[in-house]
Amino acid sequence: MSPKERIIMGVDPGTILMGYGMLHVAGNTPRLMAMGVIRLEKFDNHYIRLKRIFDRITGLIDEFLPDEMAIEAPFFGKNVQSMLKLGRAQGVAMAAALARDIPITEYAPMRIKQAITGNGNASKEQVAGMLQRYLRIPDEQMLPEMDATDGLAAAVCHFFQTSGPMARSGGSAVKNWKDFVNRNPDKVR
């Protein structure tokens, strides 16, 4: 790969379905490499799901060799247990990237939607449709699970935030555990 080429892995954390997308960037031209979902519904035990997330994210990293990871931040809901589980799933995906020294940038869901559609309150369908048009994804490659396009959206958002003359200062890249702990003392003890 030339110095101006990179691969961005996007992740939409989840405890039932976790979406991912791989984006190859050459210069200022992004191209879809892959997108999909990690299915976790068949595992009753939450800890087994976390292990599966780690194993699958690590496998995807080993297969596609991404240079960077963009991950959607958990949204704040009313159900504390759901938030805890989602945060754990996100943390395990981040740990897999950090174990391979892949820098991570986290983006809020509204920021991703804003970057893709121009509307921070866009629906999942609107995000998927815009990604399909922008990346020229054939209908047969689109998946019924919107988690896959949500993962891809994180990667495309990161591309927009870091590439070309329109790049704006965006999320904060975390290069290793020490960096993460220093930036987030309230999240660790």
UniProtKB/Swiss-Prot annotation:
Pfam families: RuvC. GO terms for biological process: DNA recombination; DNA repair. Binds 2 Mg(2+) ion per subunit. It is an enzyme of class 3 (hydrolase). Keywords: Cytoplasm, DNA damage, DNA recombination, DNA repair, DNA-binding, Endonuclease, Hydrolase, Magnesium, Metal-binding, Nuclease. It is found in: Cytoplasm. Its cofactor is Mg(2+). Its EC number is 3.1.21.10. CDD domains: RuvC. The keyword Cell membrane does not apply. Mg(2+) 1 binds at D12, D147. The active site is at D12, E72, D147. The keyword Magnesium applies. Its main location: cytoplasm. Homodimer which binds Holliday junction (HJ) DNA. The HJ becomes 2-fold symmetrical on binding to RuvC with unstacked arms; it has a different conformation from HJ DNA in complex with RuvA. In the full resolvosome a probable DNA-RuvA(4)-RuvB(12)-RuvC(2) complex forms which resolves the HJ. Belongs to the RuvC family. This is Crossover junction endodeoxyribonuclease RuvC. It comes from Porphyromonas gingivalis (strain ATCC 33277 / DSM 20709 / CIP 103683 / JCM 12257 / NCTC 11834 / 2561). The lineage of its organism: Bacteria, Pseudomonadati, Bacteroidota, Bacteroidia, Bacteroidales. The gene is ruvC.
